[in-house]
Amino acid sequence: MSETDSTDFHEMREPRIEKVVVHMGVGQGGVELQNAETILEAITGQQTVRTKAKSPEPEFGLRQGDPIGAKVTLRDDTAVDFLERALPAADLDRRQFDNTGNVSFGIEEHTDFPSQEYDPNIGIYGMDVTVNLTRPGYRVAKRDQGTRQIPSNHRLNSEDAVSFLVSNFDVEVNE
């Protein structure tokens, strides 16, 4: 192995996708929530989980525990496949990346996906996508026994996340 190879690349420094969470907040149960769940299952290919109101909001007629949305968590190859379809429909901006290497973006219409067509009986739904990036070795901060902090030089930052998405998914990030 040459000297330049050892300084440019190390397998423990390579970012990877831990998970992708796709969320649709409808604000109420009933037919709208069922439509959102159907759309999410069709786009992601996985079963949805309902999200519930954490606190009562009388102004909106919500009680604690009322179903108000649906979400799907994708990992491994399904997360990569979903991002390959979702990122062309999104306009990424530098401020959508946080300091720990995560990115969140919205897709305004579910019809932006190639597999989805407009159905007047359902309408148009938008969704929020959150991508969580990690590096190998992050488990030491999450394990039950012997937890340690991740060293600052090993933590992901927004520049690492931007370069990962640009190089692996060929997206353009606006300044």
UniProtKB/Swiss-Prot annotation:
Statement: the UniProt record of this protein carries the keyword Ribosomal protein: yes
GO cellular component assignments: cytosolic large ribosomal subunit
GO molecular function: RNA binding; rRNA binding; structural constituent of ribosome; tRNA binding
Keyword rRNA-binding: yes
Family matches, as InterPro entries: Ribosomal_uL5, Ribosomal_uL5_arc, Ribosomal_uL5_C, Ribosomal_uL5_dom_sf, Ribosomal_uL5_N
Alphabetical keyword list: Ribonucleoprotein, Ribosomal protein, RNA-binding, rRNA-binding, tRNA-binding
A Pfam family the protein falls into: Ribosomal_L5_C
Biological process terms in GO annotation: translation
Domain of life: Archaea
Family of the protein in this entry: Belongs to the universal ribosomal protein uL5 family.
PANTHER family: 60S RIBOSOMAL PROTEIN L11-RELATED
Subunit field text: Part of the 50S ribosomal subunit; contacts the 5S rRNA and probably tRNA. Forms a bridge to the 30S subunit in the 70S ribosome.
The protein's role, per its UniProt record: This is one of the proteins that bind and probably mediate the attachment of the 5S RNA into the large ribosomal subunit, where it forms part of the central protuberance. In the 70S ribosome it contacts protein S13 of the 30S subunit (bridge B1b), connecting the 2 subunits; this bridge is implicated in subunit movement. May contact the P site tRNA; the 5S rRNA and some of its associated proteins might help stabilize positioning of ribosome-bound tRNAs.
Protein name: Large ribosomal subunit protein uL5
Lineage: Archaea, Methanobacteriati, Methanobacteriota, Stenosarchaea group, Halobacteria
